[in-house]
Amino acid sequence: MIDKKQKQKIVSEFGKNESDTGSVGVQIALITGRIKYLTEHLKTNKKDHSSKRGLLKLVGQRRSLLRYYQKKDLEAYRILISKLGLRK
């Protein structure tokens, strides 16, 4: 799981200020961090089906947030996906 220091680092990097935890960019970045952690976890624990289900749920949640962000603010969306390395 992402610890408190990593969350603060993500919030300070992608948020407008230190306490900006609810903006779409921060939410997408936090979900991406959790997805990366679960992906590594599932490489060693292949039979952990509940974590796999949680991973798929997070991917769907991130996809819907990305779709919303793309419609809302295209330029910020492009900056975010380039920072996170999500698309080519």
UniProtKB/Swiss-Prot annotation:
SMART domains found in the cross-reference section: Ribosomal_S15
SUPFAM superfamilies cross-referenced by the UniProt entry: S15/NS1 RNA-binding domain
Pfam family, one: Ribosomal_S15
One Gene Ontology cellular component annotation held by this UniProt entry: cytosolic small ribosomal subunit
One BP term from GO: translation
Entry keyword set: Ribonucleoprotein, Ribosomal protein, RNA-binding, rRNA-binding
Top-level lineage group: Bacteria
Transmembrane segments: none
Subunit structure: Part of the 30S ribosomal subunit. Forms a bridge to the 50S subunit in the 70S ribosome, contacting the 23S rRNA.
Biological role: One of the primary rRNA binding proteins, it binds directly to 16S rRNA where it helps nucleate assembly of the platform of the 30S subunit by binding and bridging several RNA helices of the 16S rRNA. Forms an intersubunit bridge (bridge B4) with the 23S rRNA of the 50S subunit in the ribosome.
Name of this chain's protein: Small ribosomal subunit protein uS15
